[in-house]
Amino acid sequence: MCIRDRSKIVKMPDSNIIKKYNASNINVPSSMLDWMRSNHAGETGAVWIYMGAKCIFWNKKIKDMTKEHYETEKNHLIVMGHILPKSSHSKLLILWRILGFGLGFFSALLGYRFFCVTIQSVETFVEEHYQEQIDFLYKNSTSFELLRVLEKCCDEEVEHQIDAKFQKGNDKNTGFERFWSNLIGSGSSLAVNISKQY
């Protein structure tokens, strides 16, 4: 089970994070620019999900999960921001921050289980989103350096997904939780399509 000791979060300088992900000298192929724009926008939203959840400071379980997941998502954002030219960043970053914060705050406010359902749903979508890009790069034998970065990010997103599912417990999702998960999937898909263009 991919559950880390949450008491041992070590912060690293940005340059060390970029080295850790082997992302120092990567040129984004033109065929990947839209995808990478959506990745950067998505990681921005993810960071702000956890910033919103941090406001529910009285819930220790949410606080602990947020502490670990936030650091990983922040690393991903640093890496995506380094790889993607600033001129290619989404013009709607303020929107992704607001939506991410709102999602994190609202879901955490409804309790730990609901927050776990939310994170599991988000990460399920993110895994599929990254896997689509990984498959594309494999198929086209394009930028194996970028491929390795995306694989590492995807693996860490899957860890978050497994963590959230494990913490939620084995109970089946309620009808509302299933509706909420589907809504997150549809909303995430819409956000990706918009961020690819703007």
Identify the residue ranges that each predicted region occupies.
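Non-heme di-metal
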Residues: 4-198
